[in-house]
Amino acid sequence: LNLDEIVAEMKAAHAVGQDVARVHSGDPSIYGATAEQMRRLDVLGIPYDVTPGVPAFAAAAAALATELTLPDVSQSIIVTRTAMRSSAMPAGEDLTTLGKSGATLAIHLSVNNLKNVVDELTPLYGADCPVVVAYRVSWPDQAFVQGTLADIRDKVKAAGFTRTALILVGRVLGGAEFTDSRLYAADHTHVLRPAK
């Protein structure tokens, strides 16, 4: 259904007193195209609730038993996508600009643009930078391909991933050495753990 058809279905159901559950995959706040639906429901005066979901990058990290932020490695995660047939990326949100940060990248909707992802990030992260491509993460048939910027394209091609995949890029994915967080250090106090 297109947007007009989706809204028409919700409007018709609301008119006869039915409750509607508009289910999205992942978290509706990230690439869910829910804002445009909510805007139309607001105009129509139809009330709604938004229930948070689990973002694909968080589900992938859990399935991989990894943390996407590690002390002295990366303390930031950038959630982004690349432009192909969808809406253009705003100025300054291209991979070359975002990659200059060195942050862990969670790149959605871009597995068919993997060549450009690799080409843009290799000069910034290095060919040996770890990459994970997560296919249908959190579904029973989820699968992962692990590699580096140098070899991930061949591995993804061999796996046959052509859609519904998330690309994670960053040193945190490679078992990097890191120092323990200060959060649980014996000499670190805070409101929930005052000094002894």
Which residues are covered by each model-predicted region?
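A cross-family phosphate/adenosyl-ligand binding-site feature
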Residues: 1-13
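Short glycine-cluster motifs
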Residues: 12-84
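A contiguous loop/helix-start segment that scaffolds small-molecule binding in enzyme catalytic cores
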Residues: 5, 15-21, 33, 39, ...
